[in-house]
């Protein structure tokens, strides 16, 4: 799916709730096509040369380095914009974006994070990803809302990472919604296109942990 489709679906919803919506293109796609190779192509190359394990290792390495660096650069840029409240920056993502959300909340001072289906498609075959995401939530600096549709590829990420947050005494929400669409891939796109179901829950969470400053 093209990032623009996700931006078109999600942007108006966040704006309606009073948020600035910032959706950067990842390397190799859209407006960032010349910024570096596309992560999907790099994973495919690694799989061809070294199998599933090599592909998983490449995925984790890129998401935890180059792509995380890009996320943190975007966070730093946002904090310096006059139209942004620097202490009210939240991070949210679906699929790879959910993985990035988890990695980002360990490093940046977000007020809250929303992880939809992060790592679901790769979870069972990528113990490296499980370890990296688990390690990140252990050090999470902000509350996280984990959610998935019941028919997503694997519900392990939400259940496992929520359990880690609970064990660490960190604030979180865990939610498994009813099946979305007819296939597992439909379920995996719930974070993009299922806002009619999750909208109230997500923005109640954001309002709780990222309250607007009271006018003086």
Regions found by a protein language model. Name each.
Residues 93-97, 101:
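Gly/Ala-rich beta-loop-alpha elbow adjacent to hydrolase catalytic centers
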């Amino acid at each position: 799916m093209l990032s623009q489709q996700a931006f078109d679906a999600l942007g108006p919803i966040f704006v309606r709730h009073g948020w600035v919506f910032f959706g950067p293109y990842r390397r190799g796609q859209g407006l960032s096509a010349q910024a570096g190779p596309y992560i999907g192509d790099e994973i495919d190359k690694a799989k061809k040369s070294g199998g599933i394990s090599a592909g998983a290792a490449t995925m984790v390495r890129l998401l935890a380095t180059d792509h995380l660096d890009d996320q943190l650069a975007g966070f730093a840029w946002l904090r310096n914009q006059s139209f942004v409240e620097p202490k009210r920056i939240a991070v949210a993502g679906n699929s790879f974006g959910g993985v990035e959300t988890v990695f980002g909340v360990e490093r940046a001072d977000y007020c809250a994070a929303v992880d939809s289906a992060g790592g679901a498609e790769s979870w069972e075959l990528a113990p490296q990803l499980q370890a990296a995401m688990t390690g990140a939530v252990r050090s999470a600096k902000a509350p996280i809302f984990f959610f998935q549709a019941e028919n997503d590829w694997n519900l392990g990420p939400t259940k496992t990472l929520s359990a880690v947050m609970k064990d660490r005494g960190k604030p979180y929400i865990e939610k498994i919604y009813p099946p979305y669409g007819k296939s597992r891939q439909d379920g995996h796109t719930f974070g993009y296109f299922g806002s009619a179901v999750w909208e109230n829950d997500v923005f109640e969470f954001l309002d709780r942990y990222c309250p607007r400053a009271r006018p003086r």
